[in-house]
């Protein structure tokens, strides 16, 4: 959007992603309020709350569709956790210290695990909770401690493996780079905000956000 020569028009965002405003659909999932509805779903995999915000700082970020992207993404994370605690399909291991549904390896290949009975398969993806540390630091640390205590079943030379299922006794010792990267980035963003600061300081980023109608209010602080 910020390109001075071939920048896409703001309408690409407003008419495309925001669906002419139809993206705004206040509703509750697991008793938690969400303001937006992506692709017609109530709540999706946790990468929705993470990948866009590895560099783009959600703290205080808002536009005409969402009054606070940080709080929206935090609530999306809390929905994911609450669903795993409720555990309607009674999967082994799910609970307050073991939650996190997102796209990852799965027992039958690869799947976008989400907090609903149609799209979750009893698979916990460590990246889901760990990359959410900017939104739910205490809850994410609880998961990290539990996983670390599970030892080499879920932890290897490059960190936590991509996914596992206690119900299926499935502990593949393999990684997926697109899931590993956000863990390191979001831990550093929680610790120092480094990647957010670097990305947001670029003039092209600021110009693009302005063109698309975003603004920030840093009084909208993170909840520790």
Give the residues covered by each predicted segment:
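Ser/Thr/Asn(+Pro)-rich, low-complexity disordered segments
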Residues: 1-224
């Amino acid at each position: 959007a910020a390109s001075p020569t071939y920048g896409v028009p703001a309408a690409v965002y407003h008419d495309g992603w925001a669906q002419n405003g139809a993206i705004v659909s206040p509703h509750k999932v697991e008793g938690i309020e969400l303001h937006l509805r992506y692709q017609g779903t109530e709540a999706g995999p946790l990468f929705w709350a993470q990948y866009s915000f590895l560099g783009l700082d959600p703290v205080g970020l808002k536009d005409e569709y969402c009054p606070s992207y940080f709080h929206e993404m935090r609530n999306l994370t809390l929905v994911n956790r609450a669903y795993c605690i409720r555990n309607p399909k009674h999967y082994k291991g799910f609970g307050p210290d073991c939650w996190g549904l997102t796209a990852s390896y799965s027992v039958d290949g690869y799947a976008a695990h989400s907090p609903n009975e149609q799209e979750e398969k009893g698979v916990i993806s460590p990246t889901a909770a760990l990359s959410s540390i900017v939104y739910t630091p205490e809850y994410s640390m609880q998961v990290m401690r539990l996983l670390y205590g599970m030892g080499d079943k879920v932890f290897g030379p490059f960190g936590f493996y991509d996914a596992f299922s206690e119900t299926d006794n499935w502990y593949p010792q393999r990684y997926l780079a697109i899931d590993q990267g956000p863990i390191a980035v979001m831990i550093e963003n929680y610790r120092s905000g480094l990647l957010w600061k670097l990305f947001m300081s670029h003039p092209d980023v600021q110009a693009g956000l302005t063109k698309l109608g975003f603004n920030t209010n840093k009084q909208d602080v993170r909840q520790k």
